[in-house]
């Protein structure tokens, strides 16, 4: 008998969202409520994953079906972010040598490569509809670079001794440029010069002394231009929708190649042999099923996926069940227990060092305290919630971790 899963239901003016979590923070609830209150998203199936927490512009853990409108800000700036998981034939690795190789050959933080990686040949970024808004040279030199924040390179060991290389990274600054361009275009297309027109009208009415009429006029003008939708939820439709989908898919491919380039540098530099490899993506639109996933991953029937928990507990290798009620999706991690700012305030380096004992890492430093295991929800909390959408095949535990500070 399937056990009951804790769930929070959020009813809005035009839609109802289901969040697969026992507890929902107020900020995340407000963001989800805002989406459910927009008539433009009526009829979209909104399902929010157990690792839910408030994000910039949209709740992390959001999945929703889409039709002819998309909010670029909901996919976010790190388009195509995800994990490349590689099973290795080796059972032992020289971690000191690996760490030195990564620090020498893989740019991290805001750094990019001096030379472009050979995998650039598989992508033509000049085909982006917004190519003139993008620093193409920097983008090309970013393929094979890690970035900062929660991005990491890790070696994990399964219970049977097998080793897995996991690389978590995204589309670097290119994703930010593409996302910001389309979000701005969406705002312009929706509102045009409406804000300017309203301001000019108010100034004129004040000059004419018609103060009592101002509020009524503003309301009428706002209705005329439909300014009710929040700034963060400005959407694109029509030709802009098509252009965004085109550029998002290219940027998604860029992110995949970025991870594969880092894998290539590590495998060739260390002389390691891959046995199996799979990709798990968590900020994108699945254009086959027309499902938006923000901080959530695809879990189609039979699909292999990785759910990383934290840098102490490792990851879950899972097989999707294809649960339509969950939008064939799963969480992309454990989800944050506290914001980055709160983590820096509340957590200690002593505790961080103690929690990471037994794992080879040179990255347990004050700058990465916000990424410490204590800043995330527990593995048990996630395992309890995901039974309807995935089968856990195995848990892999970190033996090496590299995480850049920003």
Q: Which positions does each model-derived feature cover?
A:
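A generic, well-ordered mixed alpha/beta core segment in the N-terminal half of proteins
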Residues: 72-127
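Glycine-rich phosphate/pyrophosphate-binding loop regions near the starts of catalytic domains
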Residues: 63-64
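Acidic, glycine-rich active-site loops and adjacent beta-strand->loop/helix elements
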Residues: 52-53, 81
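Domain-length cofactor-binding catalytic modules of enzymes
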Residues: 8-34, 41-48, 54-60, 69-72, ...
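Short, Lys/Arg-enriched N-terminal segments with co-localized hydrophobic residues
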Residues: 1-6
């Amino acid at each position: 008998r399937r056990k009951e899963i804790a769930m929070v239901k959020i009813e809005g003016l035009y839609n109802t969202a289901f969040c697969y979590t026992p507890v929902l923070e107020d900020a995340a609830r407000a963001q989800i409520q805002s989406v459910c209150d927009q008539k433009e998203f009526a009829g979209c199936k909104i399902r929010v994953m157990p690792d839910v927490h408030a994000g910039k512009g949209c709740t992390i853990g959001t999945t929703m079906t889409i039709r002819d409108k998309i909010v670029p800000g909901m996919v976010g700036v790190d388009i195509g972010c995800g994990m490349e998981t590689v099973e290795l034939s080796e059972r032992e690795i020289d971690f000191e040598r690996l760490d030195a190789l990564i620090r020498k050959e893989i740019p991290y933080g805001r750094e990019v490569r001096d030379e472009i990686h050979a995998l650039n040949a598989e992508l033509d970024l000049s085909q982006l509809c917004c190519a003139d808004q993008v620093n193409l040279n920097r983008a090309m030199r970013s393929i094979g670079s890690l970035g900062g924040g929660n991005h990491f390179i890790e070696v994990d060991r399964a219970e049977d001794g097998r080793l897995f290389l996991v690389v978590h990274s995204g589309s670097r600054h290119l994703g930010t440029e593409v996302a910001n361009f389309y979000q701005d275009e969406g705002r312009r297309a929706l509102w045009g010069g409406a804000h300017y027109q309203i301001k000019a009208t108010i100034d004129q009415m004040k000059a004419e002394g018609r103060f009592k009429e101002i509020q009524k006029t503003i309301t009428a003008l706002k209705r005329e231009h439909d300014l009710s939708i929040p700034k963060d939820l400005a959407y694109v439709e029509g030709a802009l929708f098509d252009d965004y989908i085109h550029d998002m898919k290219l940027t998604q491919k860029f992110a995949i190649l970025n991870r594969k380039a880092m894998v290539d540098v590590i495998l060739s530099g260390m002389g390691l042999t891959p046995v199996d490899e799979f990709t798990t993506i968590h900020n994108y639109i699945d254009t086959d099923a027309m499902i938006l996933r923000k901080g959530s991953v695809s879990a189609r029937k039979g699909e292999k996926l990785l759910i990383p928990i934290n840098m102490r507990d490792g990851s879950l290798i899972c097989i999707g069940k294809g649960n339509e009620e969950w939008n064939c999706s799963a969480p992309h991690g454990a989800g944050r227990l506290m914001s980055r700012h709160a983590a820096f305030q509340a957590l200690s380096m002593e505790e961080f060092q103690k929690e990471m004992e037994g794992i080879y890492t040179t990255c347990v430093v004050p700058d990465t305290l916000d990424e410490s295991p204590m800043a995330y929800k527990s593995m048990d909390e996630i395992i309890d919630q995901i039974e309807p959408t995935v089968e856990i095949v195995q848990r892999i535990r970190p033996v090496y971790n590299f995480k850049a500070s920003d």
